[in-house]
């Protein structure tokens, strides 16, 4: 039997090209996944470092300084430590609920990043119901916390899970009319359209000036959603040890830790998008685009500037929840619920009524 060498070479080249196509296809699938995940991870590490440095300054002490330059790698060292710690399971608890709870909390918050625009058209999912999708997704996280508390078979954990669910429901309801007011002003529920609607009048076109009452209610509700002081009732150390986290250790405890800061970053980014103009700088780029012929709303330069502006606004806003943590005392549970149902909800509904009336009169 005579083997044609040209046919063998053709078969080999074809198989090589097919394997290269498969490799490029796999890389093309992984890059869009790992790029936002890496960016979010770095963002969380920066938040942890900022909180430790600001907290150290408020308490007049030295913050982390040994792990990396200025202690910026301290959070990474803590995460590595938790990764190698023993993962203990409660002997009489529901292991499935106990294990699934932290994952649900983290995944639901990660999905919220899909509708956040970091620059001009730089968003994973530009949906017409973007802001309301975020509200719907954020409602899933308390279910994971309640599952964690129930699966632990511990009275402190279960009480913390119930508190987390009650707190989330109480403050998500006043938060929704604030978002609806912004949608009415922008004539859209898309996060891209909301940012572009604020770019018409520069700095004075921000929704912060058109919705000051809604802005305050949104901030308070966001802090309660993130379970930050003075709203950290589900994790009150003096009453519940650590709340729904009491029985957790190792990487599962680390997931709750990450979810807390992920939620804080999501809230800050949505404050930036809804009230602070998003990626718009609101002042001219000082002749740089005109000098080099760069488009302000597109291209590499415009996209990079938009990302930097969005992150700068979000991280500047983070000073409010960080300083609030070391300023205000923890509220009681009855005070927490009264604030949400008796004060914030009527105020947000009144603000929505005023916004609707003004929009109808302007037609």
From Swiss-Prot:
Keyword Ligase: no
A GO term for molecular function: quinone binding
Biological process, per Gene Ontology: aerobic respiration; photosynthesis, light reaction
Keywords associated with the record: Chloroplast, Membrane, NAD, NADP, Plastid, Plastoquinone, Quinone, Thylakoid, Translocase, Transmembrane, Transmembrane helix
EC code(s) of this entry: 7.1.1.-
Bilayer-spanning residue ranges: 30-50, 98-118, 127-147, 248-268, 300-320, 336-356
Catalytic activity: a plastoquinone + NADH + (n+1) H(+)(in) = a plastoquinol + NAD(+) + n H(+)(out); a plastoquinone + NADPH + (n+1) H(+)(in) = a plastoquinol + NADP(+) + n H(+)(out)
Quaternary structure annotation from Swiss-Prot or TrEMBL: NDH is composed of at least 16 different subunits, 5 of which are encoded in the nucleus.
Protein task: NDH shuttles electrons from NAD(P)H:plastoquinone, via FMN and iron-sulfur (Fe-S) centers, to quinones in the photosynthetic chain and possibly in a chloroplast respiratory chain. The immediate electron acceptor for the enzyme in this species is believed to be plastoquinone. Couples the redox reaction to proton translocation, and thus conserves the redox energy in a proton gradient.
Family classification: Belongs to the complex I subunit 1 family.
Protein name: NAD(P)H-quinone oxidoreductase subunit 1, chloroplastic
Record lineage: Eukaryota, Viridiplantae, Streptophyta, Embryophyta, Tracheophyta
Name of the gene encoding the protein in the UniProt record: ndhA
């Amino acid at each position: 039997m005579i083997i044609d060498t040209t046919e063998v070479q053709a078969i080999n080249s074809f198989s090589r090209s097919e394997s290269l196509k498969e490799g490029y296809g796999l890389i093309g699938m992984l890059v869009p996944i790992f790029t936002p995940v890496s960016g979010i991870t770095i963002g969380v590490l920066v938040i942890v470092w900022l909180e430790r440095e600001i907290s150290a300054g408020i308490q007049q002490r030295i913050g982390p300084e040994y792990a990396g330059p200025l202690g910026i790698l301290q959070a990474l060292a803590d995460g590595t430590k938790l990764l190698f710690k023993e993962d203990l399971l409660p002997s009489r608890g529901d292991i499935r609920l106990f294990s699934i709870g932290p994952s649900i909390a983290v995944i639901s918050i990660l999905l919220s990043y899909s509708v956040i625009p970091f620059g001009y058209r730089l968003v994973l999912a530009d949906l017409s119901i973007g802001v309301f999708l975020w509200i719907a997704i954020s409602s899933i996280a308390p279910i994971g916390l309640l599952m964690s508390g129930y699966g632990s078979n511990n009275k402190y954990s279960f009480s913390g899970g119930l508190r987390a669910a009650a707190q989330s429901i109480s403050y998500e309801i006043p938060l929704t009319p604030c978002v609806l007011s912004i949608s009415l002003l922008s004539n859209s529920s898309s996060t891209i359209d909301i940012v572009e609607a604020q770019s018409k009048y520069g700095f004075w076109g921000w929704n912060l000036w058109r919705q000051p009452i809604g802005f305050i209610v949104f901030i308070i509700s966001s802090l309660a959603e993130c379970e930050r002081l003075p709203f950290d009732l589900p994790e009150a150390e003096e009453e519940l040890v650590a709340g729904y986290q009491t029985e957790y250790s190792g990487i599962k405890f680390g997931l709750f830790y990450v979810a807390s800061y992920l939620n804080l970053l999501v809230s800050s980014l949505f404050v930036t998008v809804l009230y602070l103009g998003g990626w718009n700088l609101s002042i001219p780029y000082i002749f740089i685009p005109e000098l080099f012929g760069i488009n302000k709303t597109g291209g590499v330069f415009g996209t990079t500037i938009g990302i930097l502006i969005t992150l700068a606004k979000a991280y500047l806003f983070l000073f409010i929840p960080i300083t609030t943590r070391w300023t205000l005392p923890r509220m009681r549970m009855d005070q927490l619920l009264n604030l949400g149902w008796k004060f914030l909800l009527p105020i947000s509904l009144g603000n929505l009524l005023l916004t609707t009336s003004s929009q109808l009169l302007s037609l």
